[in-house]
Structure formats: C-alpha cells, structure tokens
Amino acid sequence: MCFSKMNICVMKIIFIFFLLLCSLVTVSSQSVLIETELFETKGGWSIDSQFIDQMGSPYLLAHGLGEAVEDATTEVRFPETGVYYIWVRTKDWAPYPKGPGRFRMIIDGKELDHTFGASGDIEWKWYKAGTVRIDNLVTEIRLRDLTGFDARCDAIFFSKSAEENLPNDVDGLRLFRKKMLKLKDFYYEGEYDFVVVGGGTAGICAAIQAARLGLKVALINNRSVLGGNSSSELRIPTDGELFRNKYPKIGSIMREIDNGFAGVCNENLSMYRDNWRLKIINNEKNISLFRNMHVYAVGMSGIKIDYVDAMDINTLKTYRFSGKIFADCTGDASLGLLSGADHLYGRESKAQTGEAGAPEESDSLTMGTSNQWYATLTDSISAFPIEEWMLQFTEDYHFELTKSVWNWETGFGNFHIVEDSELIRDHNFRAIYGNWAYLKTYLRDKYGKYKLAYLSYNAGKRESYRLVGDVLLTETDIRCKVNYPDAIVTTTWGIDLHYPDKQNSRYFPGQEFIAYAIHPNKRKEDYTFPYRCLYSRNIENLFMAGRNISVTHIALGAIRVQRTTGMMGEVVGMAAYLCMKYRCSPRQLYTDYLQELLDCVS
C-alpha cells in the first residue's frame, strides 16, 4: 500500500493526538473523587445540605451530642493498585483554639495516621493526608467519628500525582464534581405552568391552590420533609390567626396543613404532621413533588425566568424544570437572587422609608436563627464535661433550662444571616453545649440525671433577604392602617422584632445568642396588606410568598409567622392561575384583572 507524504503527515498528527488523549485519560483514570453524601452506608452520620450555596456541597455530619457516632462506610473501585496521595475536604468548625469535630479515616482496614477536623482553621479546604497503598481494586473506606461533636467531611480525593490543584470555590467544585463523577449536564423534567421553589407553608399552599384550579405544578423542596420551619426538622409550630381575614376564603388550605397545636420542640414528631402534609400533596394529581432538590441556577430570557436547575442532594444529579410562572417560597429569596431580582437586606434607614422605628442609618442587623433542643430525665447520672471550644458560662451567667425557648437565636448583624449561616448554626451549638456542660458540671444534684437527647442541626431563620415588589410594605402602612385597593392578606400578629439581649451583650459582646422582643400589640393588630407585595418589580414572571416578600425590616415583624405566609401562598396560587388564564404577568393582573382576583378570594 502506498501513502503520500501528506497522508503520512496526517497520520502522524492523528497518532500524536491519540497519544495525548491517552495521556489525559490516564491522568484522569489515576484519580478518584468520593463525595461523602454518596457513601453506601451513612452509619450515624447525617447528610447536611443547608449550606450548599456557601460551601459548595452537601456533606456528612457526625451529630452525636457528645457521643461518637457509628462509622460511615462505602466501597470504592480504584482504576489500579499502587500508592495514592490523599486529600480530604473538611474544616475545624470551632477553632477556639482547636475544635471538637475530629475524625479519622480507615482504608481497607488500616487507619490513616492523620486526625481531621482539628486544624485550627475554620474555613472549608482540602487537607493533604499523606499516602496510602491500595492493594485491592475494590476497597472499603470508613469515616470514624472520635467525639460526637459535629465532625464534618465533604469529599475525599485520591491521586497518583503528588501535586493537585483542587478547586475550593462553589462553581469550581461543581465543575470538578461533574467531570470526576461523569455527571450529565441535566435531566429534563418537563415544562410546568407553575414552578414553586420552597416547601414551607407558603410553598405548600401556593402549590395546592394552583393545582386545585387546574395548573400543572412542580413543587421543589430542598428538604426531605415538607413544612419548612414548622416541620419536624425545625419544630416551630405555625402561628398567627386564620379566622380574622378580610377575605374569609383565604386560610382554608392553611387550615388543612396547620400544626399550631404542636408547640415549640415537641418530642412527639407526629404533632408536626409531616406525613399528613405529604399525603395531601401526593393526593393532588396536578402537583409533581420533588424532594431533596436544591435549586442553584436559573435560565433567563431577558427579565423572565425560563427554567431552574436543581441538584438532587442524594445523587448530585441536576434536573431542569421549565415553567411559565415561578414562585420564590424559599424564605431566603434564593430564586429571586439567582434571577437578578431587586432585593433588600438588614434595616432600612429612616430617610429611606420614613418609618418612625427605623434607625438613622441603614445597617445589617437582622433577627436571628435558632436551633431547637431538649434534654430528658433518665435513671442514671451522666457527664457532659466543659470543653475549651464551648462558650463559657459562670455562676453569674447561665440558664437553668432543659429545653430550648424562643429567644435563643444568633445573627443580629454580628453574622450575615445567609452567607454565615453555617457559622451561625455552629455558634448556637457552642452556646447550647456550653450552657449544658455548665449545668451538668456545677449543678449536678439538679441536672445529673438529665441527658441531652435532641439538638436539631437544621437551623430555623426568622429573616434573610427580601425581594422588592411594586409596593414595599412599611411600618407606617401597618400602624396607620393604610388601605390599598389590592389589600388581600390579613396579618394579625403585630410588629414583632428581636434584638440582642443587653445582659447577653455584656457577657458575650459581638457573640450574642439571646434575644429580647419588642412586640407591643401581639395578636391584636390586624392589617390587610396588598397583593403588590407578592411579586417582583423587575422579574416579569416571579411571585414570592413567605418571609422574603416585599416588606421593610420593621414590617417583616408583622407578616413573618407561618399561618400568614401560608395565606400568602394561597393568594399567589390563585394569582398564578389567573395569570395563566389571561396570559398576563403578575403586574398586569393587578392593572387589568384585579377585581377578578378579589372575586376569587371573596
């Protein structure tokens, strides 16, 4: 066979390219990424997915309340045997000076000579942990908790190369994960009339209302249970009134899912009605429910949302949901922020809002975040030693409690309520563990037989970002009973705002975790606020319901309780139906079809 010089040249180029390609494949095949949330057996470790937007991923948490939890285990298939370098992505969550979240890793029955979680560095990062010889292509890996005090591990990376530049930012980690785990760009879940993001009371009510009016609805929730703050994960019951509305029809769906009788941090989980709420949703033929799905990206056409992308926290696969109308019921305004919606954070100044109670200068103060807990009385005495990383209590300042109360909360402008959400949760841990250790150590006669039985690692927020609508509800509106033509949802709670407790500030300046409330008209101040607070002023097809609607910081104090947010959801569900009926935007519904909306709720 005869080849021309040109053919030979082309063949050489192809051969060289093939060698380069093989080289790249070899490099890739000589490394292994393990995401801990994909471990086959979690043991006593839990998947914590609250902080994906801040640190990049769900992770495993060893939340044992001071008692080491059972190992998490998985089997890993290596591309070849030999020596591998190891990196582990973790953090020291309480480096004061070094934290308690220590754990070890066991590979093929051999424990690494490296303790993780006590580096003295509070940031998430990759830690190089030496080398290991892999003799079996299929090898067992174990995470062994040493303390029961919230060790955490995000990912493990093995490489034949001694030097790796591993990403640590959210976007970089997502691309790295996609490449290493060979994840598809997305799986398409179809097009919906109405896409509701967030499965708290607002999201549930919005989805049910729209579905019962005939819309095809996707309800996307990033938790395994429905209910948000009122679920068994957070145990804050619903509050506010459902029978004093200007329009009595509003509140009927909220009454179906209500759990205000449960009380704060009830030990009986069934009181929070997780299963009942799930049953109601599953019985709605027009609702497709997607649990454990975290929305992290949107697709836009100008100022309209076309679709949202959500990551399944149990598989890390991405699913795409197209829609005509969207509702942000996330509480944190997550969907609104992703889409570029105008938003507010912290306290507005008196000059900005004209409110009598506003500060002279705007600031970042917000109401705080809480973690519920309780202890139970046992038959035997147990210890809970004071440790250096805990907040330190004294005879002069401690709290004799066996259960959480409403005013244990962290935030207040000392921490950013969203960006520092993991730090806030961990600060609550340090306060709760520290006070409990003081009681168990110095008041043993009274608390010796009590045992810390429950502390939620899921944190419940009161405030975060708020999206701006065509009307920004203010303190003046509520106090002066300003009557808007589109007044539609009645709040009965009164303006309830939380601030750092002054005595707590004296003992823990800048680290407050106790609040006091200003709530002069509790349950006595009815006010019906307008529909125009429930849609974005600059994103054409975005509704919102929940604590992230268009209100000032002060006005938020009146509308944030969960029966009220559920009623917002009902209105948004009706409005979404009318928008589909008339092929109009939420704003056009106000300008052109307001009377029909009011007729719907009458």
Model-derived features with residue positions:
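Bacterial Sec-dependent N-terminal signal peptides
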Residues: 1-30
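Beta1/beta-strand and adjacent pyrophosphate-binding region of the FAD-binding site
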Residues: 188-200
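Second-shell loop/turn segments in exported
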Residues: 195, 243, 261-267, 418-425, ...
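N-terminal Rossmann-fold NAD(P) dinucleotide-binding loop
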Residues: 203
